[in-house]
Amino acid sequence: MMELITELFDEDTTLPITNLNPKKKIPQIFSVHVDDAIEQPGFRLCTYTSGGDTNRDLKMGDKMMHIVPFTLTAKGSIAKLKGLGPSPINYINSVFTVAMQTMRQYKIDACMLRILKSKTAGQARQIQVIADRLIRSRSGGRYVLLKELWDYDKKYAYILIHRKNVSLEDIPGVPEISTELFTKVESKVGDVYINKDTGAQVTKNEAIAASIAQENDKRTDQAVIVKVKISRRAIAQSQSLESSRFESELFQKYESTAANFNKPATAPLIPEAEEMKIGINSLASKTKAAKIIAEGTANELHYDYKFFSKSEVDEVSEKIKDVIFNAIKNEPTTSIKCLEKYAAAVNQFFEEYKDNWLDKHNKTRKGQPDEVWGEITKNAWNAAKTKFLKRMIYSFSGIGAGPMIDITIACDGSKYTPSQKRGIREYCGSGYTDINNLLLGRYNPERYDVMSEKEIESAINNLDSAFENGDRIPEGITVYRAQSMTAPIYEALVKNKVFYFRNFVSTSLTPIIFGRFGITHAGIGLLEPEARNELTVDKNEEGITINPNEIRAYKENPEYVKVQIGWAIDGAHKVNVVYPGSLGIATEAEVILPRGLMVKVNKITDASNNDGTTSNNTKLIQAEVMTTEELTESVIYDGDRLMETGEVVAMTGDIEIEDRVDFASFVSSNVKQKVESSLGIIASCIDITNMPYKFVQG
């Protein structure tokens, strides 16, 4: 049976691995992406002081290496191993691929993995057999396994690899044969060892195996976890991967340099900065927007809803204009805060006409029982109000952002070099799909849209150069984009409150997520809680709704369920961006954020709704750009607290830092943002249906 297992095993089946501390000269802390669960197994490479429980990082000159498995939790912390995922054998294959590379590169003579048999899904022996085959096939006969260690312990499965031409007892870090367990006896055939408990004679390798197990049985994985340094960026990278991807050499090359473009801005402020601020903050532009919206709304309420006579249109228009202007006068017209206040005002004055609507609606009643008619009326009113609010927010999103479009049309991108302009034009044109697919690990050289791998490499290099030259937009500007995200990645985002963009991030200076490029599909997210709860369908701010007809597919493959996200991103002024202007499609008012960007999630709002068609799993996410200066790359965690309480407490030497540190709070701002309750109504106005794909891809 065991031979059959090894014959069926594909030794090329390795899983995606992320180095969780890229700063280390010798990579030694890794996560392994085994499936789409939000918790993933990982492993640490380390060494121990002889005979003790004290572990340390590998360094040049070490000859004995230990592999310690762990679990990377949804919050990005390290905990005791919970399991190896659905395929323990593929996990072991991936681990020993890294181990063999490390041993060869750093001339390590021995390596040992110890794993609880209870965590192997009953495949402990298969794992040992597979490891044996891998070592024999990949080491060219230079390394062998100490099989005498396989069955020594009922609790642990041991795998020890050592260089074939080096005696185990001569390797620093391998314990001497225990005099507590064995008596050494000289004989004509050499030294033999007698087991003190049984009196049986054993081979030297059996004595070494027993001594190794005796020493390591006393060691705890907890001691390894206590002071582990991990990179928050690397964790976010590992948890933003989808299961199906093509990790080419170029993917790995650009992944390794992504952090270079997340540094604090060095570019000068764009010449249009003051004009932008005036355009969205001036009372004149707000008065104009309020007047245009009010005139259109008054006519709609008269002609479409018949709420009042034609002679009253001008009076109602003036009233609506005052309501809107008073709501938005203190906020930039493209900000979430402005849209939120606008949505609350619109909702309020539409409610004033509810009695008019009910009078008309009740005339359509055809003898239904009161209970049935009440439910019909409630649903019809909610649908009518939802449609109205979505149209209103759609209109304001375009009109309020008008100055941004005019300014972008006049921008010529003259600061960029010819090669940088070429990269920008290729990206803003039809090349963005292939460019971002490569950065996302989705590019297939046999099936691409318009650009070959060589052309993509040139385009990315030109774009990277453009970001180094770069633009800096003024502070206080919100940029918008959308994204369709798989359920596992979204769940990791919810837990971590941080998201990592591998690709170049197309955003707009206008609130395009509320329907600029199509019919508004999700319009109720900006409302205050009472009104939002009346209109949303998921009733779930951060969670995912699985419809009954999706349950089976979701269980088989969690990536089946998608979450539609509208991003409202602040803080883009902190990093160099590319403002294409006329080098792109100027009416999109595009701002390209750099690849490798990390954002902190400040707020997630349920944007689901039903205006006749149900839209589940739509979220408005307010986020903030985090630079490398704001993001501490690694910390030392208190493993005792972590495993006992789930808290991730940072340590400095032997002194705990007082503030609790975890992925829900590590990037929290000094100033807590107060999110108005009417946010819900605007969130549900999110529409990514007909949006250009570059504003969605990710």
UniProtKB/Swiss-Prot annotation:
GO terms for cellular component: extracellular region; virion component. It comes from the Viruses. Gene3D superfamilies: Toxin ADP-ribosyltransferase, Chain A, domain 1 (3.90.176.10). The record marks 7-8, 633-634 as: Cleavage. Residues 375-628 form the TR mART core domain. The keyword Transferase applies. One of its GO terms (biological process) is regulation of viral transcription. Pfam families: ADPrib_exo_Tox (PF03496). Keywords: Glycosyltransferase, NAD, Nucleotidyltransferase, Transferase, Virion. It catalyses: L-arginyl-[protein] + NAD(+) = N(omega)-(ADP-D-ribosyl)-L-arginyl-[protein] + nicotinamide + H(+). InterPro entries: ADP-ribosyltransferase, Phage_T4_Alt-like. Its EC number is 2.4.2.31. The keyword Nucleotidyltransferase applies. The active site is at residues 481, 506, 590. One of its GO terms (molecular function) is NAD+-protein-arginine ADP-ribosyltransferase activity. It is found in: Virion. ADP-ribosyltransferase that efficiently ADP-ribosylates one of the two alpha subunits of host RNA polymerase RPOA on an arginine located in the C-terminal region. ADP-ribosylation of RPOA alpha subunit enhances the transcription of viral early genes. Also ribosylates RPOA subunits beta, beta' and sigma 70 and performs an autoribosylation reaction. HAMAP family: ALT_T4. Belongs to the Tevenvirinae NAD(+)--arginine ADP-ribosyltransferase family. This is NAD(+)--arginine ADP-ribosyltransferase. It comes from Enterobacteria phage T2 (Bacteriophage T2). The gene is alt.
